[in-house]
Amino acid sequence: MKIEYADAEGRWLPTSVALMMDAVKRCQVRVAYRDGTVVCVNGNEKERLKSGGIDLPPCGYWAKSGDGQIVVASDDVGGVRADYCESPKYIFLRARGSEAVRAKARTEGTALCRVTDDGWEIISLGNRPCAFRIPGGTATALDFEGKELGQAEATVKDGWYSVKPFPGAFSYRVKR
């Protein structure tokens, strides 16, 4: 494991050097694990963390598993603060304020797309518009208990699969 701290110029310093130079007070840290997992945290409440391709807002974070299958971030890509997670089992995005677009999700609110045995389940809190980069298929609107409400209108545009909000729907079952 390697722990480093960023200095004011964005250079990553080993902990021993960062302690001597007071860089640890900036609260901008990167941890690299033996399996290739990397975690970057900007604990600074006022300054951005910009170093080696990482650009995080105050109190932001970014991490990627060693195999590249899991990515999590709290960032402000395109000027929109959002929390994002992408994994083999689900994609999650919570936008803060306006529409957020990340690698495999797009929404103005909070949305989740989880893998099921025969496709996916899309949950959009407040039944707000959202889109995911999934192959798609037929969509069925479900209420909170999982009861079918009817077929929902779904579209694929520019690689984004979206379901038109269906009145009373809690989630959407998307079959391959």
Regions found by a protein language model. Name each.
Residues 1:
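Aromatic/acidic polysaccharide-binding cleft in carbohydrate-active enzymes
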Residues 4-11:
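Ordered core of a single globular domain
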Residues 50, 132, 149, 173:
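Short acidic, gly/pro-rich beta-turn/loop elements at beta-sheet edges
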Residues 54-68, 134-149:
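Solvent-exposed beta-hairpin/edge-strand motifs
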Residues 55-114, 118, 156-176:
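C-terminal beta-strand-rich structural cap/linker in extracellular carbohydrate-active enzymes
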Residues 151-155:
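Short, surface-exposed loop motifs enriched in S/T, G, D/E and P with embedded aromatic residues
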